[in-house]
Amino acid sequence: MNEQALVSVENIFSTVGVNAHGNCSKAVLHQVPESETSLFSVHPGEKLAPHIHTKTWDLFIAVSGNGEIRWKGKDGEGVAPMPTHAFCAMPPGYEHEVCNLSVTEPFSFILIHAPWTGYDFVKTKKS
């Protein structure tokens, strides 16, 4: 039987992130085969390179700062504004990049990868 424990973090901003993708920090809050939940903080004026996931949804919840997600997929292409408290669900197979619109403040968001089993990060040609 798979033993699971309760996870409680009083202040997610007190977690220590590691450098991820060279221009942001990532602090993993919870990970099971069904999903991974992390706090990402994109540095001021930076962005995460365009990429896709072939099997995994990206669920974004903006918690501070101001960003946007530029996307392209079978439904066309567009921009999802991500001010504080915004939500975006990015399906597998959609190219997307996360941009911090501020040059002075980080853009922080909770990111849930679901499922975590089989997670893949595939850079696209314009990366």
Give the ranges of each region predicted by the language model.
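A short, N-terminal "cap"/entry segment at the start of jelly-roll beta-barrel domains
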Residues: M1-S38, A49-P50, V79-T84, C88, ...
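Short strand-connecting beta-turns/loops that link adjacent beta-strands
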Residues: P33-E34, K55, K74, V103-T104
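A generic "binding-loop/recognition-motif" signal
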Residues: S35, P44, K55-T56, Y94-E95, ...
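His/acidic/aromatic-lined binding-pocket segments of jelly-roll/cupin-type domains
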Residues: L39-F40, H51, W57-V63, C88
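Histidine-centered metal-chelating micro-motifs
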Residues: K47-A49, E68, A86-C88, P92-V98
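Intrinsically disordered, low-complexity cationic segments
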Residues: P50-I52, I112
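A short beta-strand-loop-beta hairpin characteristic of the jelly-roll/cupin
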Residues: T56-T84, C99
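Ligand-binding loop in jelly-roll beta-barrel domains
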Residues: P81-T84, P92-Y119
